C-alpha cells in the first residue's frame, strides 16, 4: 500500500508471506543444484600448444601468427564490403523522383557532393571559433577569466587582439581561483596586471544547486543562497558603474581557456546554477545568454582553442584533449618538469625522485595503483597527477615577471582607452577587501610552478588543422572506389612473415583463444604433410 505524502510504497509484509517467498526461493535453488549435479562439471580442454621438442617450432609460430593476422584483415575487408552493399541497396530503394534529382546532381560534379556530405559533420573546434567570435561581437565588455595559479599562461594574445581591433570594447581581467595561491603572490600579480588592464580578484562559489526549491505543503519558493564567493560585489560595482556612464544596457562576454571557471563566475553572479559546470574540460560548447538584471546581460562562451605550437606543459594544462593528443606520461612529465621538485615531494609524500618515470613509479606505489602482476601502474599515476593539476583543488602558483613591459599587442594609448569609464580607485579598495577575506592555501598545498608565458590560441577557422578522427571515419565510410579493395587484397597476400621469435615454455599458449590456435594447427597439418613427426621423433 502506498503511504500518504510519500512516493514509495512500504516494504512491510506479513510473516506468512515472507516465509512463503523464502521457501520458494530455497526450493528453486535446490532444483538448480540438482540439475547441475546431473549434468556434471566438464573442464574445458587446454590446448598444450606446440611442444618444445618439435622441430621448426619458430617457423610454425610465425606462420600461425601470420595466418591469424590475415584472417583479421579478411574480416575487416568483409565488413567494409557489407557496409558498401548496404549503401548500394539504400540507394536503390529511393523513389523515382528522388533518383532523377540525384542523377542530375551527380552529373554536375562529384566533388561538391563530397563537400556537402562533409559539411554536415563539422569540426567542433571550428564551431567553437564561430561561437567565440559571436560572443566578442555581441559584447560591450569582455571579461577574460584567468586562473590565479598561472595568470600569464591563461592570457591569449590572439583573442585580446581581436577585442582591440573590434572597436570600442572594453577588456577586463578576472583572477579566478584566488584562494588557491598565497596572498602575497596574489597581490604581486594584481599589481602587475593592473598596469595594463583593470583586474578583479574573484573566487567563484562551488556550492551552487538548482535554481529553485519548491515544497508542496507550504507552496513557497525558496531562492538559493550562494556561499563562499569573494569578489562578487567588486565585479558588480565595476559593471554597474560602466553601465551608468554609458547610459544604456550593457552586454558582458565571458571568455577564457578551459577550466578557468567562466560558467562558475556567471552562476556566482546570478546566485543560481544556470550554466553547466563540472570537472571535465570544455563543457560549454555554445554561447549562452543570461540576464543579470534589466540593464546588464552576461554571455557565456566556449573555451579558447589552444594552438599546437605551444609548449608541452601549456598543452597539457590548457587543452581538453591533451591526454588524447599527448600520451599521459608525456603530458604529466611536462607538468612535472615545470614544478619545484622539493615541494612536489612534500605534497605527494613520496621520497626524492631522479626523473618523472621514477616519480610516477613511487606515486603509484604510494597510492596503491598496481597492475595485474603487482607492478606499479605508471600510466594511472600520470593520469592522477594530470587530473589534479587541471582540477580546482591543487594550489600551485607562479611568480610574476621581474620587469614589466607592455604586451606586444598593447601600448599606452590602448591601456588608457581600456581603463576609461571604470572607477579604478573603488576597484582597488574592493580588491584589497577581497584579498583580506580570502583564506590562503595550506603550507603543504603550495607548489611553485614555472610559467611558460602567454599561451597562443586559434581564433580563425582556417588555422585549425583539417584532420580529425571523425572526418577520417567519414572518409573511410564514404569511399566507394573499387581500387581500394584491390590494394587491400594485395596487401593481405603480400604480407611478410613476422621476424621476431618467441621463447615459450611447454605449458604456455601462443594465442589468446585456444579455439583459434587449434584451428591454426589443424590447418597447418592439412597444408604441409611432408614432415611426419610420429615416425622421425618418438
From Swiss-Prot:
Residues 59-94, 460-473, 481-491, 514-524 have a biased composition (Basic and acidic residues). CDD domains: Nucleostemin_like. Residues 129-307 form the CP-type G domain. The modification Phosphoserine is found at residues 95, 101, 493, 505, 518. It is found in: Nucleus; Nucleus, Nucleolus. Disulfide bonds: none annotated. Residues 277-451 are annotated as: Intermediate. GO terms for molecular function: GTP binding; mRNA 5'-UTR binding. One of its GO terms (cellular component) is nucleoplasm. It comes from the Eukaryota. Interacts with MDM2; this interaction stabilizes MDM2. Interaction with MDM2 occurs in the nucleoplasm and is triggered by a nucleolar release mechanism, such as mitosis-induced nucleolar disassembly. May interact with p53/TP53 via its basic domain. This interaction is most probably indirect and mediated by MDM2-binding. May be required to maintain the proliferative capacity of stem cells. Stabilizes MDM2 by preventing its ubiquitination, and hence proteasomal degradation. Belongs to the TRAFAC class YlqF/YawG GTPase family. This is Guanine nucleotide-binding protein-like 3. It comes from Rattus norvegicus.
